[in-house]
Amino acid sequence: MLTRPARILRQGCLTSGLLFSGFLSFLSLPVLAQDGAYSEPAGFAECKARLQEQAITAGVSSKTASEVMSEVRHLARVIELDRRQPEFTTTFADYLNRRVNDARVSKGRELLKEHQELLARVTRETGLPAPYLVAFWGLETNFGSYFGKMPVPSSLTTLACDPRRSTFFTEQLIAALRIIDEGAIPADQMEGSWAGAMGHVQFMPTVFLKHAVDADGDGRRDLWNSLPDAMMSAGRFLESMNWDGDYRWGREVLLPENFDYSLADGRRLPLEQWREMGITDAFGKPLAREPINAALVVPAGHRGPAFLAYHNFRVIMGWNRSEFYAIAVGHLADRIAGAGKLQNPPPEDAPALSRANIINLQKALQQRGYEPGNPDGIMGPATRSAIRQFQAANNLVADGYPGESVLAALEIPAGQ
């Protein structure tokens, strides 16, 4: 396992959501034959050769391409992790509690003060408020304490040679080789997540190439060892997605009794219209009269918190296309800036659905004439829309959430 350069900042400690370092070293091991020697799956060598030629054609130097690709190994564990995405089965309560907790809030506030000069510079140049920058940093790498230990060239080659998302990861691999080619980091030090995300803010290689900057003036775009480079790059990336510095990400709100939860379907309405429906802020005060649109989000259904998501919520989702993630970033930023906990925390007893649960739910909806999309075990917009329609037709709260009442009505055991 490669040793990380000494310059890397190491604030904070690993959270419960991260794996023990000994196990992590196992994750990066290649496929081994019975005698312990490295063994590649059939066709992998040919795939590597094709990718090397593609990289050279795309402008990577022959020297870099050949040297890096000669050291690439197939990582079977990467394929396993690519097939198993925990975002699909965790509850909102579990997700939020793991990512926005007192320890992380306290550390974030400490770092907000420690790096106030740097963060103020990033805010001046990009428009990104400091608490959001620190929140992204906290969620991505626990404030720089863990960047991932997978060898990025090997991870990306493994994924590029897998047919499921070959085109996407081929592009990422070529971008990673270009990053090495420009001298940002030596190939043997390019470590990251199993999917190839790198550095303090976990940029994918294509995002790195387009948005990473040299903010400390040392001639390199170094997102591993330079916090100025990492923070400014994060600011530039979010700025490129039209972050609106005049408004926050959104806010927790209170809904009136007998509210029509079918409105929480992604539609964006003027804030004044939500106000006229009786929605208030989390403390019962009237919403501000601002000329902006917002969408209502109820990530844990009608039993959990409700949020009005503004334009910047969509910008956050441009970084990570998960509503859970976007809420976590916004809420953590609020907490770091001094706000308190949610007024209506998510229910701890919500059922945690497996892929099998969701597939059975999707099939049950199909059998009843609804259109949840292909039964793939993913709670996407089509599935939520079908749930909402089923709920409305069966006198259930139409929040689009697969709670116990929906599972019972569809005769699906929660533990199935």
Question: Model segments located where?
Answer:
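N-terminal secretory signal peptides that target proteins for export/translocation
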Residues: M1-R10
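Cleaved targeting-peptide boundary
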Residues: A33-P41
